Amino acid sequence: MAVIIFVNGIRAVNGLVKSSINTANAFAEEGLDVHLINFVGNITGAEHLSPPFHLHPNVKTSSIIDLFNDIPENVSCRNIPFYSIHQQFFKAEYSAHYKHVLMKIESLLSEEDSIIFTHPLQLEMYRLANNNIKSKAKLIVQIHGNYMEEIHNYEILARNIDYVDYLQTVSDEMLEEMHSHFKIKKDKLVFIPNITYPISLEKKEADFFIKDNQDIDNAQKFKRISIVGSIQPRK
């Protein structure tokens, strides 16, 4: 059983990246074949594959632009347009090379495999590349962020929602929101909180009036980092 997690880079220090890495780690710890595939970056995209958090050594990482370069038709179609996105903070052009790679990935999957999409762009590209043919693998799209404010992401997800098997929220309050806004069956909605691990933070409490050679006690504190998405407008 293989789990593919499509990501828009794993270099940033934010909740989305940490959630993606922790999800990959959790599957790898269970002995599954896990592959993080990056969708952004130029040339090889390698600059977006330096994780700021611990990544399980068995998790494979690749950029989609650098996969299957041994297939002649993949190399020859790098200058043929396939997909473009022009959002305020996300602009990218994807050649037909990406289409061939996504088709190749689909051809290698079975009913026991899963794909997790962390951004609706990845979902739409996968659907278009495979000509709307239902994937053999289970398709899961995760909701990260505020989709009422990120209207472009909302629109992409809305037109591709029927292609996925499950829509995963990271907050149980979002289940009814998703059902209401996208009119999808409740059995396709899954609440799975972000997989998080405690981070040990050391805090030194010092008294500035004590002598320099006096021992200072160290207190250990633990903090959990996670994110909660919503499609509710912010107040």
Please describe what each predicted stretch is.
Residues 13-14, 198, 232-235:
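A short, basic/aromatic alpha-helical/loop segment that forms part
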Residues 173, 195:
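Carbohydrate-associated surface elements
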